[in-house]
Amino acid sequence: MKRFVSYLFLFSAIAFTSCNKLNIYDKKDAKLKFSSSIITFDTIFTSVSSITKRLVVYNPYSGDINTDIYLLGDNNSYFSLNINGVAARKLTDVEIPAKDSIFIFVKVIINPNQQNTPMLLTDTIRFFTNGNTQNVELLAYGQDANFIVPNRSLGNLSYFIVAGEGEEVTWTKEKPYVIYGYAVVDSVGKLNIEAGTKIYVHKKGGLWIYKGGCLHVNGTQDEPVVFQGDRLEDFFQDDYEQWDRIWINEGSQDNIINYAVIKNAFIGIQAEILDKDMGNKLILTNSIIKKSAGMGFLAKNYTVEAYNNIIANCGQHCIALTQGGTYTFIHNTIYNAYSLGTRATPSVFFSNYYIVNNVMYLSDFHCDFINNIVWGTNKREFNCDYDKSALFQANIS
């Protein structure tokens, strides 16, 4: 009898264990929940320091979940993880019980006095669950600066409003500005940028002057305003497409950029009417736009005056004036010796239309292109294309 009871107990234990193992949620729709989608270490360090933050990972389902967790960065990452008590950069088959959670502790070590430390330190914790991938972003401030970190989103665009409606804001040169995501000047807002100010933009980020907003960049010959990527190592100084663009919509006043250096973007400046023309223009003077992976200057049905600028070494066009508009370009140098790939496009391109998703947008085009230098490594560096349904006038001399 005792032996029978022992066997019965053993069978019950095995059955209970087996039932538990079957209580696994393995459907393809599995999505974990997180206490935060981005962990920000927002302390500006003045000495070598470390700080730890906590991420809670929730299993919202009635069954247990197994997930793989790993840090995407290489072994030189500034971040380290402790996953539910285990120090590891990668851990597979981490079990999260039903309706329960685990803790991940994230640590960052920063030396802000090291000049080569990036302005922004970033990495990603990736979760792979039942074939689904989810990310939690890590962000730390590497050097002393003014950091602009998004607090809202529009579709896939994360942004922070730096000048709200009716607000005028001035950026000064005392400390650099670091943009993560997009910095937005809202409608009827105005951003002034003083001479000598440095703006570092993280990958895929940019500056957006929304319709009705206004940008005044007030650089000087001795102290230009610099826009560039946030990687400061020597290796990245000649790298293309480190950030996205300066995007300027129709302004409540003239947008003015004087003595600026805009480098290493995908598109240096994109000026376009988003809704309806307000009768104001973009004035670009004494500035340098260089090393854009796409276009240096792209305009769509805009009014632009450009004097004494250098636009150089772009992967597509240095200047593309499209979808109509009114343009004056005088005493500019366009130089294109882009060498990172094959460039099939001319350095300068004019058109009175623009096609998006097989839809043609067409407007009258007028351009005075006077006393400019155009040079490049392609046989043909200047091209025009137009539709006869709208006016096309190009005065080139």
Residue ranges with predicted function:
Residues F4-I14:
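Sec-dependent N-terminal signal peptides
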Residues F16-S18:
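C-terminal motif of bacterial Sec signal peptides marking the signal peptidase cleavage site
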Residues N20-D26, L32, S36-T43, V48-S50, ...:
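Beta-strand/loop edge motif enriched in small/polar residues
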Residues S50-T52, S62-T67:
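Short acidic/proline- and small/hydrophobic-mixed sequence motifs that coincide with surface turns
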Residues V57-Y61:
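Asparagine-centered strand-capping/turn motif at beta-strand->loop junctions
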Residues I69-Y70, L121:
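Short coil/turn segments at secondary-structure boundaries
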Residues L72-K90:
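Short, solvent-exposed loop/linker segments at beta-strand-coil boundaries, enriched for Pro/Gly
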